[in-house]
Amino acid sequence: MAYEFVPLKEKYQKEVVPVLMKEFGYKNIHEVPRLVKVVINMGVGEGSRNKDVIEAHARELTTIAGQKAIITKAKKSISNFKIRKGMSVGVKVTLRGPRMYNFVYKLVNLVLPKVRDFRGLNPNSFDGKGNYSFGLTEQLVFPEISPDQIKRIQGMDIVVVTTAKRDEEARRLLELLGFPFKKQ
């Protein structure tokens, strides 16, 4: 398997778990919050009119994630947006296991430092159940994407799903994994 190098999972097991057990007073190792999945989504509005745009972004997302991206379809028709039910409206990929850990490692160490005018992630973007969402404005910050290949700059949403029950537990987990949050 090509995904054997997983430095973030080792860091989680050796450094993060003991710190979280001590800070939050967990008695069982299975109570400690962990990452479940990372969902990367690109909403491509122009894709409903131009199939080539959707396919190009699907290829880019596949390259970024290392896993085949799926094209999402509209669930219902919205006349104001000129969208009918079943039209292609975006691209997404769900990462779990070693691919997820490698993506998060790459995101924290390579991608976020390359973002222009980056001051840290917003610590208020948790959903109340321990999941964290944020957006990137362009796909050029990923090392796999070269500016010559892309036709159109497109942003993306990234959702990090954890088993944490509360936002403070999830935030501490992500801080220990290296996510750079803004100081409040």
UniProtKB/Swiss-Prot annotation:
Pfam families: Ribosomal_L5, Ribosomal_L5_C. Keywords: Ribonucleoprotein, Ribosomal protein, RNA-binding, rRNA-binding, tRNA-binding. InterPro entries: Ribosomal_uL5, Ribosomal_uL5_bac-type, Ribosomal_uL5_C, Ribosomal_uL5_CS, Ribosomal_uL5_dom_sf, Ribosomal_uL5_N. GO terms for cellular component: ribonucleoprotein complex; ribosome. One of its GO terms (molecular function) is tRNA binding. GO terms for biological process: translation. PANTHER family: 60S RIBOSOMAL PROTEIN L11-RELATED (PTHR11994). This is one of the proteins that bind and probably mediate the attachment of the 5S RNA into the large ribosomal subunit, where it forms part of the central protuberance. In the 70S ribosome it contacts protein S13 of the 30S subunit (bridge B1b), connecting the 2 subunits; this bridge is implicated in subunit movement. Contacts the P site tRNA; the 5S rRNA and some of its associated proteins might help stabilize positioning of ribosome-bound tRNAs. HAMAP family: Ribosomal_uL5_B (MF_01333_B). Part of the 50S ribosomal subunit; part of the 5S rRNA/L5/L18/L25 subcomplex. Contacts the 5S rRNA and the P site tRNA. Forms a bridge to the 30S subunit in the 70S ribosome. This is Large ribosomal subunit protein uL5.
